[in-house]
Amino acid sequence: MLCYDVRWPKTVITTECWRPGIGPQSRPGPDRYGGAVPPPPAARDKVLDAFERLLIEHGERETTLDAVARAAGVSKGGLIYHFGSREALIDGLLARLEVLADEDVALMNAAPEGPVAYYIRTSAYADAPIDRTLVAATRLLQRSHSRTREVLADVHDRWYQSLLTAVGDPATARLIMLVGYGMYYNATLAGGDPGAPGPAAEDDEVLRLLQELVRAQSAGKP
């Protein structure tokens, strides 16, 4: 019987054997089931980072498994070890977004200045992890991924619910949401760079006006 190890990139994933008259067979490699560590979890994040980056820079059409593997600096077999298909890559990206949204909503609800101020001050694109993952996910909507649409809708609804709890009025909460969307869009017009810094003084003025509106609404004024 002739045998050889299949490795990724230095770890034995499986051992392929060939017995004359029978054909190829596989048996678990010692590193996979014999106590050694499989490819490190960091490699999975590296692949997701590459997928995210390609989506942002080139759109969905350029995110083939081969392209993602090249961008991540891994073999295609290494990519498939973590993500067996392109749909699995998308699921991984959406799972990352849900985790980041959990963290962001927790920060929003615990912010000393309150959810409204936190939401407005973080609405401008800052190249934070959640910013990048959100932009990447929106690129997937170009081909109507229903699962992506559901996750994005859930993320935005959680921001809305946090604002609604803070201000107590659905219309006011929605207005604040739309102002945040507008601030993000305005940032993208700054030389086409969504990460370009915006005028902080203007942001402060927008926040002041919104806070006045919230106070007036709470007091029952028009």
Stretches found by the model and what they are:
Residues M1-P38, P222:
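Short, intrinsically disordered or compositionally biased N-terminal tails of bacterial proteins
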Residues T122, A137-L140, V179-M183:
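Short acidic/histidine-centered micro-motifs embedded in hydrophobic/aromatic stretches
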Residues A128, S146-A153, D157, Q161-P222:
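Hydrophobic/aromatic-rich alpha-helical bundle segments in the mid-to-C-terminal region
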Residues I90-L97, T148:
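Alpha-helical DNA-contacting segments of helix-turn-helix folds
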Residues A50-L54, T122:
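Short amphipathic alpha-helical elements of helix-turn-helix/winged-helix folds
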Residues K46, L54-A88:
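Helix-turn-helix
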Residues V99-A137:
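Hydrophobic alpha-helical connector segments
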